[in-house]
Amino acid sequence: MNIKQIVQGVGTQLRSLAMVFSHSFRPRDTLCYPEEKVPLAPRYRGRIVLTRDPDGDERCVACNLCAVACPVGCISLQKAERVDGRWYPEFFRINFSRCIFCGLCEEACPTTAIQLTPDFEMGEYRRQDLVYEKEDLLISGPGKYPDYNFYRVSGMSIDGKPKGSAQKEAAPIDVKSILP
């Protein structure tokens, strides 16, 4: 060994020590998770919920678009019809052990019934506990869109009311009268 190699080795050791000491006084990148909350991105896609209208009815009309859009097929539902003609899901089931939280179900939903929340703490010990039913998914509020009501916006007729008589609804147009 010559002097050049010894000086180079000592310099390498001193540089390593300086790097360790410089990192000792910096803020840590690691968070103690349960005590310190993890900062989430503004558009983080977490747990899926079903929302309600401003009137309190559930928004889902059981159109099955969310189940068709789901790439892993973790959503299943069965359509039923109320006395007034409005559709609703008789059962709505999401298997979160298969869900990849892609958000395609939220994009496909015409009524904004399905919404993804920033909640990510869904760990369970048994796989069966990750299958959520409609009662587990329904929340009491309207979610991200508080004033949206599908039946008011879409212009669907309500049984017992003539067309054009609802609030902010234009009178129906007779298309045969405007034909050439």
Swiss-Prot record:
Recorded catalytic activity of this chain's protein: a quinone + NADH + 5 H(+)(in) = a quinol + NAD(+) + 4 H(+)(out)
Disulfide bonds: none
Name of the molecule in the record: NADH-quinone oxidoreductase subunit I
Any one GO molecular-function label of the UniProt entry: quinone binding
Matches recorded under InterPro entries: 4Fe4S_Fe-S-bd, 4Fe4S_Fe_S_CS, NADH_quinone_OxRdtase_chainI
Record text on subunit structure and interactions: NDH-1 is composed of 14 different subunits. Subunits NuoA, H, J, K, L, M, N constitute the membrane sector of the complex.
Record-level GO BP terms: aerobic respiration
Keyword Nucleotide-binding: no
Localisation per UniProt entry: Cell inner membrane
Membership in a protein family: Belongs to the complex I 23 kDa subunit family.
Record domain 4Fe-4S ferredoxin-type: where: 48-80, 90-119
Membrane topology: Peripheral membrane protein
Keywords: 4Fe-4S, Cell inner membrane, Cell membrane, Iron, Iron-sulfur, Membrane, Metal-binding, NAD, Quinone, Repeat, Translocase, Ubiquinone
Cofactor mode of binding and number, as noted: Binds 2 [4Fe-4S] clusters per subunit.
Residue numbers spanned by region Disordered: 160-180
Keyword 4Fe-4S included in the entry's annotation: yes
